[in-house]
Amino acid sequence: ETTGLADPAPVLHSVMSEPTLLARCRLEGVITVVDAVNGMATLDSHAEAVKQVAVADRIVLTKVDLLTGREGEDMLFAIIARLRKLNPAARLLTTHRNEATAERLFTMGLFDPTKKTPDVRKWLAAEAYETGEKRNRRRHAHHDENGHDHHHHDDVSRHDEHIRSFSFTETQAI
């Protein structure tokens, strides 16, 4: 799970290629949530939102009940049309009238990138390439600086300089 606007390609690549995760996890699918009221503006302003919709197996449309009257119907039609254009294969559910049940959300089978659009396959391939390149640079980044013989490791986080991320591995249950 990512929170807010995150590029799904690095997360998917990690889950599908990291040996530790492969041994412990099985990726069944991707669910993304789209706000029916603000979704168009979000898709217009954030490439990550477009990617989230494009890779999803399930799209959950929230706040549908707030779209009332003729204007609301037009907004709902427009956001649904946009989502269908970005990802015609995803199952679209709303939170209205209990449509997004656990069974509908989580019964989807294994994630299969070969069944995704060419853009999604391209994003995943680019992530695999970038991850491999960074790994190769880290393996070879060794030098003597200021009398200290050590390795430098690139920050593989692709955020700006104000956002940092890290991970750690435990061998026992926490």
Stretches with model-predicted labels:
Residues 2-102:
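Phosphate/Mg2+-binding loops and adjacent switch elements
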Residues 51, 58, 66-174:
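C-terminal accessory "lid"/substrate-recognition subdomains
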